[in-house]
């Protein structure tokens, strides 16, 4: 069974470094068998974080501070209105990190379907995507949830960031996840009404429990070619 812990939303958002220390402490407890599998759900004050594969050109050009972290993926933003989830869970044998990422994607895709939003995986790209339209009217993929993880001693850290009611202008200063031919979006933008992290938590909880309590099951949601690839 997976324990879902909501630790800071809205005005009670948790600074990124403080949350990282909580992750590390809980990771050590799960590794040692002192704690059960847990997902931490929270919001952060505005911050940029860069995974191990971040390129210099991905970063803000104006010297805005960036926190470098030991997760996979590249640079992204966290801040008010975005729901962040940190699953600290023991993976089954044989170890399959990609399958863990796919399970997180499945939980988020199921949540979006419950909200009436069609979303998908995109071939060769992690996260959850919505087929949108660029300013020039051409089709493009728009990321609504980013995923980046780390695994040590078979136990995961880091996780996902789901854009709910956050503004999107912070992404204009970076190359989100290092992907130049796609956009970003949010649940509120897609639905045309405000959907906050607090609104999402009770809906997401059962999808996370289902996905992460059945670690040996492979997800079935197919990946689609990128919109950019389809135009090529």
Swiss-Prot record:
EC identifiers of the protein: 2.3.1.181
Q: Which GO terms describe its cellular component?
A: cytoplasm
Q: Which domain of life is it from?
A: Bacteria
Residue ranges occupied by any BPL/LPL catalytic domain in the UniProt entry:
33-216
Q: Name one GO biological process term.
A: protein modification process
The family line of this record is:
Belongs to the LipB family.
The job of this chain, per UniProt, is described as: Catalyzes the transfer of endogenously produced octanoic acid from octanoyl-acyl-carrier-protein onto the lipoyl domains of lipoate-dependent enzymes. Lipoyl-ACP can also act as a substrate although octanoyl-ACP is likely to be the physiological substrate.
Q: Which PANTHER family match?
A: LIPOYLTRANSFERASE 2, MITOCHONDRIAL-RELATED, OCTANOYLTRANSFERASE
What is the name attached to this protein's record? Octanoyltransferase
Lineage per the UniProt record: Bacteria, Bacillati, Actinomycetota, Actinomycetes, Micrococcales
């Amino acid at each position: 069974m997976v324990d879902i812990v909501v630790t800071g939303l809205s005005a009670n958002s948790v600074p990124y470094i403080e949350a990282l220390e909580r992750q590390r402490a809980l990771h050590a407890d799960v590794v040692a068998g002192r704690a059960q599998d847990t997902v931490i759900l929270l919001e952060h004050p505005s911050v940029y974080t860069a995974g191990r594969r971040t390129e210099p050109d991905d970063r803000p050009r104006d010297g805005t501070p960036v926190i470098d972290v030991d997760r996979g993926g590249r640079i992204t933003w966290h801040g008010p209105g975005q729901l962040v989830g940190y699953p600290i869970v023991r993976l089954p044998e044989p170890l399959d990190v990609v399958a863990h990422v796919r399970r997180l994607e499945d939980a988020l895709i199921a949540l979006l379907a419950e909200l009436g939003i069609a979303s998908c995986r995109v071939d060769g790209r992690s996260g959850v995507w919505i087929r949108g339209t660029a300013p020039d009217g051409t089709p493009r993929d728009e990321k609504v949830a980013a995923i980046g993880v780390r695994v040590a001693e078979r136990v995961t850290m880091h996780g996902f960031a789901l854009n709910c009611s956050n503004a999107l202008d912070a992404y204009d200063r970076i190359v989100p996840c290092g992907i130049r031919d796609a956009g970003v979006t949010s649940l509120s933008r897609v639905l045309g009404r405000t959907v906050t992290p607090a609104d999402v938590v009770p809906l997401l909880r059962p999808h996370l429990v289902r996905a992460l309590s059945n670690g040996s099951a492979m997800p079935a949601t197919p990946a689609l070619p990128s919109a950019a690839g389809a135009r090529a």
